Design a protein with these regions (language model features):
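C-terminal structured subdomain/cap of oxidoreductase catalytic cores
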Residues: 1-9, 46-49, 79-138, 159-199
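Mid-to-C-terminal "cap/lid" subdomains and adjacent gly/pro-rich loops that border
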Residues: 1-76, 133-136, 153-156, 160, ...
């Protein structure tokens, strides 16, 4: 996230305090104002490595910044943020049932950043996002990097920041292996191995 030099470049002022209510009224009655605007005003699909055939990351620049990723309350200064998504992650997770009861929650392990390629890709993506915002033309609007801040600069520090702040994006999905082996979940007739009568 970055602090900006002028409030006209950020949604923060319009999304705080009493202003957010006037923006809500504008939207309800005229379909205008803050709530009619996209969350991400700039989106780019980029390659983190030149030798790749197609882009492997999506970057979004967002014209607001928040004090807490959990509460999502706009900062009291003009700000912007950036987010990145790895388009084809290599890490794989797992889901396991914990009991015969359909009411018991399954055990889900996402295993985010379990693969070296994923870690390198996201570290490179953070560097690309920073380079774009730190470019000379951005001097007109950018003040300074608010978070994680310039103190986070090595690959190890960036990876730790990613681990502490990353969230899932879009829709988590997956599949399971079919076959007779011990790594397969279902057989060729979609019957779940080890559980009689479950398809």
């Amino acid at each position: 996230q970055w602090k900006l030099k002028d409030k006209k470049f950020s949604y923060n002022y319009r999304g705080r305090g009493i202003n957010k209510y006037s923006e809500m009224i504008k939207y309800i009655f005229a379909r205008k104002g803050l709530f009619s605007l996209p969350a991400a005003s700039i989106i780019a699909f980029l390659k983190t490595q030149e030798n790749l055939e197609t882009p492997n990351i999506q970057i979004q620049y967002i014209p607001f910044s928040v004090g807490s990723l959990k509460k999502r309350v706009f900062h009291d200064f003009p700000g912007m943020a950036a987010a990145c998504y790895q388009l084809r992650p290599n890490s794989t997770g797992s889901i396991h049932i914990c009991s015969p009861s359909p009411y018991d929650q399954p055990s889900i392990k996402f295993n985010f950043l379990d693969n070296d390629i994923d870690r390198t890709t996201l570290i490179d993506a953070v560097k690309i996002m920073r380079n774009i915002v730190e470019a000379k033309p951005m001097d007109l609007i950018r003040d300074f990097e608010h978070s994680p801040g310039n103190s986070i600069s090595t690959d190890k520090e960036i990876e730790q920041y990613i681990r502490e702040t990353a969230e899932t994006g879009f829709h988590t999905s997956g599949t399971c292996r079919m076959g007779p082996g011990s790594n397969a979940v279902v057989d060729d007739k979609l019957r779940v191995h080890g559980i009689k009568g479950l398809r």
